[in-house]
Every structure is written in structure tokens, then in C-alpha cells.
Amino acid sequence: MVLTSSYSVEGKPASLGPWGGQSGHAWDDGMYTTVKQIIIAHGSGIDSIQIEYDKNGSSVWSEKRGGKGGKKFDKVKFDYPHEYLISVNGTYGSFDVWGTICVRSLTFESNRRKYGPFGVDSGTFFALPKSGSKIIGFHGKAGWYLDAIGVHTQPIPKENNPSSKILLHSHQSFSQGDKKHEYSVLQGSVGQNFDIVVTLRKKDPTLPSFESRDSAGAEVTKHKLVTDTEKSQSKIEGGAKTYGPWGGTGGIMFDDGIYTGIRQINLSRNVGIVSMKVCYDFRGQAVWGSKHGGVGGFKHDKIVFDYPSEVLTHVTGTYGPLMYMGPNVIKSLTFRTNRGKHGPYGEEQGPSFTHQMDEGKVVGFLGREGLFLDSIGVHVMECKISSLKPSSPHNAIVPHNNSGTAQIENSPWANKLVLAANGHGEEVDRGVVKEPTPSGPGPWGGDGGQAWDDGVFSGIKQIFVTRGNDAITSIQIEYDRNGQSVWSIKHGGDSNGVATHRIKFEYPDESITCISGYYGPLNNSDRYNVVKSLSFYTSRGRYGPYGEETGTFFTSTTTQGKVLGFHGRSSFHLDAIGVHMQHWLGNNKSYYSRASCFKLF
């Protein structure tokens, strides 16, 4: 869509956006004193919003912007007048290949905290750039859903805070019995006083030894990338735009320059982001940049992108002082790609930041560095980026936030839905590229029992999985064929097993994109393989695993598409299983396959 915006001049209000689709009718609430509360109706997208404004002490409610639907209703109520809305971000996209674009998710940030995300965090990311302003009104487009959203902002008068600085940053250790502990001490001045932040952590023998440094005598040099190829912005077609840096003004400046893409990012952190090191791609060659920041991080993160199919599109984060009224440093970082979200890494405290460009890829970093990563900015190359599903369940971004709306019933054992991109995730090494598991065209499992094939349908509405102590006993599927429900026969034995799981999808908004599992013999003396575990991946997340994850792993990893039917072999157990896939090749073209593991690039 076309982005229209006007920026504030000399403290005057500004309008930004709208972000989203072109459908629906335009609306504009106008400008008020502040926002008091927001009511959001949402499900697979944002159905509607309604806002309570304040106008010179009087409450004013807007009309409901959007449709009458919504499976969930949330109210964001600010602590007026002390709390006010400073930023909004979210995603927009279509529910299916042919659908119109609307707002899929929204997150609101005040001067105190974040609220959300509400909806499904899927599609193209957008964000209001941080500019020291507060939101005083909304505008956009609306129909059956909230099709697009924009904001009116008003600059906030700046306060004159006393200057302060960090004087000393040290890392020390002490022994207690046979254990060794390390701690980080930061000392900073506020007038004539000191504030101290202490971080304790058990020593990790794999980490390098730490050293004490005084900021006045720290040996900091301006880094330059070491490469045999001279690079400049003019050598990259189309040039690039620079956003930021955001954060503090301490340390010295660095600029890695402009490359073709980003392959990997290594972070070191404790109370803030201590350092960052980036592996770039320059015309097919991996080029490592220098480490920017200090030493002494207690936590190390490695973010490996599946380059070139996975592209870094946005960098967001927060910054703030390490102590009361101290200088600002980067506190947290989140990396968004065309496949999902990596992070956040660090504590999301303080003002947030992002760059405004909707379509493009990050091709370089810049900022300021000292004992910490003081600030960060990005070079962005404007281009069209396609939104892709992860190429393998191994690469799925799976935060532990199961606040979704999809339904799973009768689940006494290992029955869960894990959203693929929503909320805060467990901080592990994300996006680590793993080789796909070798497998044939399916079905996967043993060659015992009788072959069966349900055929191809319009979609899948629900699945019943019955498991025994050591294998999947049976599976039964409810399909959709042109709006009519069609049940398959039960594939497998008649035993009730240990547990039966009902996986009910939000059809037609939710579709199965991949299955994975394990197969192997029932016991060491059995020469026949059966399916021992199953997991189902949908457009919203992952269901399972159901059964014991032992034996040989298999997956139906493929290009973007959806599962329209199952086939396999069965006897007293589910001996083998395969899928019928409908693959999307772009321009609304599709084709069917009975296999699933062949790369189609």
C-alpha cells in the first residue's frame, strides 16, 4: 500500500500511516489530548478497535472501527494522566493467497510498558518510529476487519535531566568452596554520588576470562571490516537508506558499511547488550565484521539466518540507562525476517525503536560502541521481500506463549499448541540452520499392514490421534470438500490406546502446512516399523508431539503450501503415513504432489 505521512515541525502534530491494505472505507478520529483506553476485538486478525480519548479533561469515545466479529476482546486501559501511548506496531497481510490485506496484529507501547501483541503476529511488520512524541489520535481504513491503521502524534516536551556518566566497569570473581562466582560491577555518577549495579552468575568454563577496564583508559579503536573486496554504497545496485542510530551518545562511532545481506549475528549481554558481531554476505562470500562493544557478557546468543532464503527485514529493540539517570545503552534487540521473529535478546526496558521502511532488507549496521553497545542503526536496501514459511520444523520459531485461539480437546498427554510467532520466546539459539532429514516421497514408516489413501480434499478440519504406550494406534481425519464435511475411516487398530487426542483447527483460516514424526520397531525383536510419534504444523503454529519421539525422524518439509489429504499403511497400528500437498508457486498457481520432502527451488 502507499504510505502517506506528515512529520512534525517545531513541535506541531504529525500524521503517520496508515499501514495495511486498501480495502474498506477511510476513517479519521482526529486529534485529542491523549488516549485513555483501547478495546480490541481479534481472532485470526484484528476485527475492530474502539478508542476512548481525552479532550481537555472530557472523555470522548470513537466509533467502532471494523466489523462485528472477534473471538477475543481485550481492553488496554492506560493510567491516565500519568501513562500515555507513545508507539504502535504490528503486522498486516491476507488470510489466504487470494484474500485482501488487513491488519493481523497490534502491539501498543506506553511510556511505562507494552501491551500485546493482539491478533496473529503474521505478515508484513510495521512500526511507528520513535520520535519523542505521544499518540493523540488514530486514522485508517475499515470494513469487515481493521484494514489499515495510522496515528496522529504530538511531540512531548523534553525535560532537562542532570548529566551523568559511567566511570568504571569491572568484572571480578570470588571462590566459595570448590565453586567460583563472577560478578559485574558498574559504577556511575549522579552529581556527587554513585549507583552500583551488580550482576551475579555461576562461572561458565566455556566463556573467555574477563578483565577489568576503566572507561577513561579503555583501549577502544574504530573498527574497519577486513576484506579483500573494497565496498561502497555505489557498488550495490539501488543504494541504501540509513536509519538511526538509536540509543545513547556515549562511546565512539562505527559503521560496517553496506553488503548484500546478513548471514549471522552474535550477541553478548548481561544487564544490556555488551557487544555485537555480524557475519555479512557480499556477493556470495561470507565476510565477518569486527566485534562492536565491550567484554564481559554473561549470556551469548548466536542467530544464524537461513540465507539467502531467509532475509533480515527489521531490527527493533529498546534502550535505556544501566542505572538511575545514567547514559543510555542498548538494552534489548529483536530481529525480524521474512520467516518470523528472532528474540527478544535482553530485557525489553526503556523506549523502543525501529526503522520505518515497510519493504526492504537490512544490509549493514552502524552505531556507537564503548563498554557496551551504546547505539545501533541499520542500512536498508529497498526491495520486495516475499514472506516465506520456514523450510523445516527445525527452523521454526517457537516461543512458549500458548495464548492462541485454536482448540485442542481431550489432552491429558503432551497436547499443546505453540504459536509460531507471538509473544516472548525462550532465549535459545534461534534460526540455526540444520540439514533437512533425508526421506523419500512418503509414506514414512513401515511396510506392514494394508495401504490406504484418503485422496485430495479442500482442507482439513480436525484430526483424532490415538496412541498406545509405544506407538500411534490409529488416526482419523475430518476433511472439508467444497463446504461439506467428509470423515475418513479409522486408519489403524480398534484399541482405545492410552489416550485419544482431538486436534481441531480453525478451518478455513488455519491449514496444515507440514507434518513430522518418528517411526521404528515396537521392540528390539520386531522387524516391522510403525509410526511412533506425530506433530502437525499449521499456518499458526505446532500441535504435538503425540507419542514417543524415538526412532527415525521424518518430515514433510516442502515449499510453501498446505496438506489436503493423507495416505499410508495401517494394521493394528498406524504403520506409515504420507501427505498430499498443494504447493504454491506464486501468481496463484498451484500443483499437487503426493510427496513432501523434495526441495523445489
Swiss-Prot record:
Family (UniProt): Belongs to the jacalin lectin family.
Protein keywords: Lectin, Repeat
SMART domains found in the cross-reference section: Jacalin (SM00915)
A GO MF label: carbohydrate binding
One Pfam family hit: Jacalin
Protein name as it appears in the record: Jacalin-related lectin 3
Taxonomic source organism: Arabidopsis thaliana
CDD domains: Jacalin
Residue stretches making up the Jacalin-type lectin domain: 13-155, 240-382, 438-583
Classification via Gene3D superfamilies: Jacalin-like lectin domain
Family annotation (InterPro entries): Jacalin-like_lectin_dom, Jacalin-like_lectin_dom_plant, Jacalin-like_lectin_dom_sf
